[in-house]
Structures are given as C-alpha cells and as structure tokens.
C-alpha cells in the first residue's frame, strides 16, 4: 500500500532538494548507415537519427508533465564514428563533415548533446581511428552539440600509450581551437579506460556495438536529496550513515526506473539501463562535495576524503541495485570540479589538489573530471596525467576517465567560465616535472596479471 508520507517525501525531493532525471539518452546504432561514399554516409546518418529520435524530446516533456519529475536533458548517443566512417573518410576533414551532420541532426530533433564522435583504441589504432582522433579539435570547434570520447585502455588489453601520447597533443589543440570560449571544446572530450557501452552521461556516451539497434538509458541526479537525508543522522555511527544513503539511493533510482520504463513504452524502444550516478550541478544544494562535508569533512580534500567517498559510492550502488532490474553506465558518484560548487570552494580554499582528486578517483565513478589547468601545460604532462588515470582503471577493473581543460592564456588562480551546466572552475596547479622520456617510449602497457581469467 502507498504510504502518504512517502508521497510527500518524494514531492519534497523534487521541489526542494533538486531531484531530477538528468538525462534520457537514446542510443542509436549507425552500423546500417555505413557507405564508402561520404555524401551518402552523411545522408544515411542524418536520416537514421532524425527518424529514430523524432519523438524523443516531446516524450521527455510528456513524462515531465505526467509525473511532475523534471527531465533536464534529452540526448542521443551513436555507434563510435571511427567505425562508421572507416570506408568513406580518407582525411580528418572527411570526419569533420560527419561531426557537422551529427550536430545538424541533434539540432533538428532538439537534443542538447549527441555523443559518439568516438574511437575505441585500447589495443591499437586503425588508420581511420587515427584520422578521427586527429579531427577532434576542429570537429569540436565547428559544432555545438557533438561530444567526443576515446577509449585508450582496458583491464583485458592494457593501455595504448601511442594513443595516450597523441591525445595529450589533441587536448591542447582542442583548447587552442576554442580559446575564445575559455577552451570549452575540451569539456566535450573524454579519455576513457574500460569505457561502458551504455553510458547515458555526456561527454562520454556512445552506443556500443554490443547494443540493440536503439535503446533507452537513463541517468538520475540527486546529491541534494542524499545530503538532506544525512542531515537527520548527524553524529550517528557509520552503519546508520550507510543505511540512510542506501535507502535514499533506492528512492532516487526508483524514479529513474519509472521514467526509463515509461520512455521505453512511449517510444517503443527497449529499456537499457538506469545509471546510478550522483551527478552534481553548479546549483547550490546539488553537490557531491556537500555530502562529503555532511559526512564530516571540513572540505573535500581533507584527510578522510577518499574513505568518505568510498563509503558514499558503495552505499549508492547497494541501494540503487535493489531499485532497478538493469543498472549500468558509470554508476557511482561524480566528482567534477567545475560542475560542483562545493568542489570549487574546496579548490579555492587550497584543500583540494589534482593529486588528491586522483586518489579519490580510485574509489568513485569516473575520474579527473572538468578540471581546468594552465594553458601552457606541456602535451607530455597531459599525457602523463591521462596515463596515471588509465592505470587506476586498468588495475582496479573499473571505468576511469580524464576530462581536463588546459585553458589557453590563463594561469593558476584565474577563473575559467564555461556557463550553464558546465559551470566555472579555478585554474589548478599541475606538477610540471618532466615525464617526457616515459611518454615518448611508445607501444602499450601490458594488461595486468589478474586480467587473465580464462
């Protein structure tokens, strides 16, 4: 029987505590669009996306009205374009035409982001994958809604250090191409280890080749709800703390499951997964950092931060798994700097460093996310940071990622303004001791011993 108090509680979560469905992401396979003729390929891609996704935005709005739950973003992910363009694209410029087509299709159907301008190169790069990677800076500069990701490592295959080296330079080039907007292009580029096929969150979403022709994946956001729940158990022991987070995560995920099933039914597209992630926004009261403070830290970055984040992440998963028949994506707690006011405050207070953020990524959901660094940082230094983060994912059998923003023309202490959901970020210092000889070795780092399960 429905408890009236729980109805009021859910209503309060939405009205006062920033509970929302962050994204309904429609994954679309473009494998049947492949052609050796570039013009024909672009037309096929545009036609497929605008046909399959034509009702996505209106469906999201209908669900909002029906349940009173904000559905903040409606998005699309597609099959990695390095595969789709392999026959037709002979130069980086050819791939850029596909990026423009994706942007046009996204604009036509009304979604705010389209992910999948991607390459999966964890063991090696084909010529088309290298061309796509080389096209990323221009592609992200000439489009508004296209997001790019590159998977450079996995627990099963090791880390492709040739790709890591190349991407250090690509990240700087992307920053240079968009320097008039505080190097915003880099906010739409994610480097992965163990990238999931069903991630609904941008900028790392792509539609994996293991997926159906089309699929609905949903991501929910509720850091404010968790923080409010923890306010009622101040001073209690860790068992009570974890139990409170679990119960709250269950309720949050149940909302995502409801929306995902309804969207699937209305669009007649199979339901894929609910992503259990706690995704913050720059809004006050919608912060993962504030949860960590409520757990007992003065600021994120203080001693105990990694343990507090591990506890939070694990409890969210335990509660969320009970609420949905299928969970997936990234599933945990995001710790982006620019998208979380509490993280920004911690950086400004001198409590949170790049190295501490790296330690936190060992126990959380993604990785070094939305971190602004000086624009004069060397490409090899960026590659070294990427390699470190990929190693954490490879050894620990988890998804890790890097979304750094080298802001051209800015130095430590300056502020980079990205606007909207991406927020703003203080420029953080980077360790500038050289790793050139390490990065320049080339080849790949072998898979760890515990990857051999057969």
Swiss-Prot record:
Origin: domain of life: Bacteria
Membrane-spanning parts: none
InterPro entries given in the database record: UPF0210
NCBIfam families (alphabetical): PRK05313.1
Gene3D superfamilies assigned to the protein according to its UniProt record, in alphabetical order: 3.20.70.20
Protein name: UPF0210 protein Cphy_2797
Family the UniProt entry places it in: Belongs to the UPF0210 family.
Organism of provenance: Lachnoclostridium phytofermentans (strain ATCC 700394 / DSM 18823 / ISDg)
Short name of any one Pfam family annotated for the protein: DUF711
Subunit and partners: Homodimer.
UniProt cross-references to CDD domains, sorted A to Z: RNR_PFL_like_DUF711 (cd08025)
Lineage, top ranks: Bacteria, Bacillati, Bacillota, Clostridia, Lachnospirales
């Amino acid at each position: 029987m429905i408890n009236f108090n729980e109805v009021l509680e859910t209503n309060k979560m939405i009205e006062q505590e920033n509970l929302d469905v962050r994204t309904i992401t429609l994954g679309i396979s473009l494998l049947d669009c492949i052609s050796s003729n570039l013009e024909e390929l672009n037309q096929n891609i545009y036609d497929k996306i605008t046909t399959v996704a034509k009702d996505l935005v209106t469906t999201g709005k209908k669900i909002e009205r029906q349940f009173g739950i904000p559905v903040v973003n409606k998005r699309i992910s597609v099959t990695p374009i390095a595969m789709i363009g392999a026959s037709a694209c002979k130069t980086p410029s050819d791939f850029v035409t596909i990026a423009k087509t994706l942007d046009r299709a996204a604009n036509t159907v009304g979604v705010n982001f389209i992910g999948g301008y991607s390459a999966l190169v964890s063991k090696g790069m084909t010529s088309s994958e290298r061309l796509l990677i080389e096209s990323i800076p221009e592609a992200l500069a000439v489009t508004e809604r296209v997001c790019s990701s590159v998977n450079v490592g996995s627990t099963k295959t090791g880390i492709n250090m040739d790709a890591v080296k190349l991407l250090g330079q690509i990240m700087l080039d992307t920053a240079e191409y968009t320097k008039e907007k505080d190097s915003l292009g880099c906010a739409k580029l994610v480097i992965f280890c163990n990238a999931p096929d069903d991630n609904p969150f941008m900028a790392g979403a792509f539609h994996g080749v293991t997926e159906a022709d089309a699929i609905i994946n949903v991501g929910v956001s509720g850091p404010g709800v968790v923080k409010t729940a923890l306010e009622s158990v101040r001073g209690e022991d860790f068992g009570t703390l974890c139990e409170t987070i679990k119960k709250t995560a269950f309720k949050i995920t149940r909302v995502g499951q409801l929306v995902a099933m309804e969207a699937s039914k209305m669009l007649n597209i199979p339901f894929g997964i609910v992503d259990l992630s706690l995704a913050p926004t720059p809004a006050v009261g919608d912060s993962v950092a504030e949860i960590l403070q409520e757990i007992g830290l003065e600021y994120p970055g203080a001693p105990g931060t990694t343990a507090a984040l591990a506890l939070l992440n694990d409890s969210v998963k335990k509660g969320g798994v009970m609420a949905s028949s299928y969970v997936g994506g990234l599933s945990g707690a995001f710790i982006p700097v620019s998208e979380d006011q509490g993280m920004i405050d911690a950086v400004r207070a001198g409590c949170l460093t790049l190295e501490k953020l790296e330690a936190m990524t060992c126990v959380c959901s993604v990785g070094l996310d939305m971190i602004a660094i000086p624009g004069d940082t060397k490409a090899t230094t960026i590659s070294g940071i990427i390699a470190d983060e990929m190693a954490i994912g490879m050894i620990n059998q988890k998804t890790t990622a890097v979304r750094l923003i080298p802001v051209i023309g800015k130095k430590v202490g300056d502020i980079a303004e990205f606007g909207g959901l991406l927020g703003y970020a203080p420029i953080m210092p980077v360790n500038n001791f050289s790793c050139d000889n390490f990065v320049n070795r080339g080849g790949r780092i072998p898979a760890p011993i515990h990857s051999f399960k057969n």
